[in-house]
């Protein structure tokens, strides 16, 4: 049994990762910034260290005595007015984790980056070697990209073994936000309009397996895209409706209409002093779409991806059991 440190252990990816680590008998240490997070982790048998995911000293305390560490914590949001919390966690937290791992003597740190950092040009398929397009779709993409680059530079500076994993949109039990929220809204009949786009997805179990395989077989300083499928949004939603046994087919809005509508909604909500449910950044990201190639993780790590139908079936079964859809 080895001791392993995890940040973000109550999130979708982190919680599933903690489950796998506990199942294989690891002594898991988790960072918790709140009482509720600490209680959740302790109830699962995780040793808890209180602190912030961007504080190097807090992270060092948690990593002491650990052979491996997984820095999963991050902030993923759109339509935010103040980028500083995202910068502090996604950039500052990435650097702090690398420095803490070096101070604590961690043999390998796996950092959860994002497929968004690939920055593929419009209409192209992104790989780990794709040159970034040079401009950002969102604050999230910018901060995760800056965090990834800073983490790599810091790892070279301090001599820390670091492997990056870059999941695309994670789907499966527990995912009720982001694209998971869109899927559930369509299946429940609450979302009747959408935009034409493509989406790359990865099953939550495959995402966790990719993290574990990166720790075991990954090459230091390299990154591995974790993405098992790319679907046009119409095909993805049709498959979801078929699996769920419902008749759902959202109308796809013209790109121009979607862009103008987002600008109007964003301005109206900001005038009212409220956070908009839709904004230009969100629509810009959706209209760009994402197409990623996750075959390197298959070749180099031995990862095997789940069939899309099975991923959606698990998601639908979980959502129904939780009362999220009818």
PLM feature segments, named:
Residues 210-277, 294, 308-326:
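Mid/C-terminal beta-alpha module of Rossmann-like enzyme folds, strongest
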Residues 137-163:
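Active-site Tyr-X1-5-Lys
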Residues 4-24:
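N-terminal Rossmann NAD(P)H-binding glycine-rich loop of SDR-like oxidoreductase domains
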Residues 158-201:
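NAD(P)-dependent short-chain dehydrogenase/reductase
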Residues 191-195, 199, 206, 255-300, ...:
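A hydrophobic C-terminal alpha-helical subdomain
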Residues 36-42, 46-92, 100:
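NAD(P)H-binding glycine-rich loop region in Rossmannoid oxidoreductase-like domains
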Residues 89-140:
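Conserved Rossmann-fold NAD(P)-dependent oxidoreductase catalytic core, especially the SDR/UDP-sugar
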Residues 96, 178, 195-215, 221-222:
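Substrate-positioning beta->alpha
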């Amino acid at each position: 049994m080895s001791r392993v440190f995890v940040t973000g252990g109550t999130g979708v990816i982190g919680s599933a990762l903690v489950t796998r680590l506990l199942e294989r008998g690891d002594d898991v240490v988790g960072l918790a910034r709140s009482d509720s997070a600490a209680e959740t982790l302790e109830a699962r048998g995780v040793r808890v260290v209180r602190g912030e995911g961007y504080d190097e000293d807090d992270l060092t305390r948690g990593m002491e005595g650990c052979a491996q560490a997984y820095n999963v914590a991050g902030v993923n949001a759109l339509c935010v007015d103040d980028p500083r919390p995202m910068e502090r966690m996604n950039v500052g937290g990435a650097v702090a984790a690398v420095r803490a791992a070096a101070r604590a003597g961690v043999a390998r740190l796996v950092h959860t980056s994002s497929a968004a950092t690939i920055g593929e040009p419009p209409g192209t398929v992104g790989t780990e070697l794709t040159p970034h397009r040079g401009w950002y779709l969102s604050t999230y993409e910018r901060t995760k990209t800056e965090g990834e680059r800073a983490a790599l530079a810091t790892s070279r500076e301090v001599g820390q073994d670091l492997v990056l994993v870059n999941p695309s949109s994670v789907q499966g039990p527990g995912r009720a936000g982001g694209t998971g929220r869109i899927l559930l809204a369509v299946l429940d009949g609450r979302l009747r309009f959408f935009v034409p786009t493509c989406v790359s997805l990865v099953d939550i179990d495959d995402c966790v397996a990719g993290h574990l395989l990166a720790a075991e077989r990954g090459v230091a300083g390299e990154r591995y895209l974790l993405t098992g499928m790319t679907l046009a949004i119409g095909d993805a939603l049709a498959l979801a409706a078929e699996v769920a046994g419902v008749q759902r087919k959202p109308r796809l809005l013209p790109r121009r209409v979607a862009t103008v509508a987002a600008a109007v909604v964003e301005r109206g909500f900001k005038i009212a002093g409220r956070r908009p449910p839709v904004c230009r950044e969100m629509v810009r990201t959706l209209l760009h779409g994402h197409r990623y190639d996750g075959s390197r993780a298959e070749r180099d790590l031995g990862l095997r991806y789940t069939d899309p139908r099975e991923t959606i079936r698990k998601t639908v079964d979980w959502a129904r059991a939780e009362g999220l859809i009818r």
